[in-house]
Amino acid sequence: AGLHLGSFALMEDHPRFRDVKLGIIVSSLRALQLFLRKSARTGRLPDYVVVEGPLAGGHLGFGLDDWMKHDLRTITTEVLGWLRQEKLDIPVVPAGGIFTGTDAVSYLETGSAAVQVATRFTVAKECGLPAKVQQEYFKAGEDDIEVNGISPTGYPMRMLKGSPAIGAGIRPNCEAYGYLLDSNGHC
């Protein structure tokens, strides 16, 4: 979770850094611009950019008080427009709030390379979630979803109100260490 601005610099000495496909997840044009500026010295652009809107599951790149003021369509349009203006050929993949095939097609028709759909597949047999958890997703309606601040990263999280993660205790913010926790939950 979070925009790790130094991630490409951390990896650039790895022998496969130039060969593997690397993508980033952003929630705004500003976040993309910051990342590209910070990673410019590595001489490598991301191979794709996932643009997550406020309806994405899990961590959100917005403030707890203003996440609902943003929308995926606007953010995606801004990112696509800026990339065209800068003549940067980086595929854009919108995510968060894409519910139907019609939604997906509308993003593809406006220049997105693909779309990311995740929550819809949590109820699929192949997902690997326990059947009890899948049933909770299947039964959930809009009123069963909340955005809260329980994440150790400090970012708001969108999740089911009945999630076992709620009330499980806050883990330390490990941002300075790359969000790595040991088996005891310590940075």
What are these model-predicted stretches?
Residues A1-E86:
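Active-site entrance/lid segments in N-terminal catalytic domains of soluble metabolic enzymes
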Residues P46, A56-L72, T76, L80-P91, ...:
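Conserved active-site-proximal phosphate/metal-binding subdomains
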Residues I25, E52, A95, V117-A118:
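Generic beta-sheet signal
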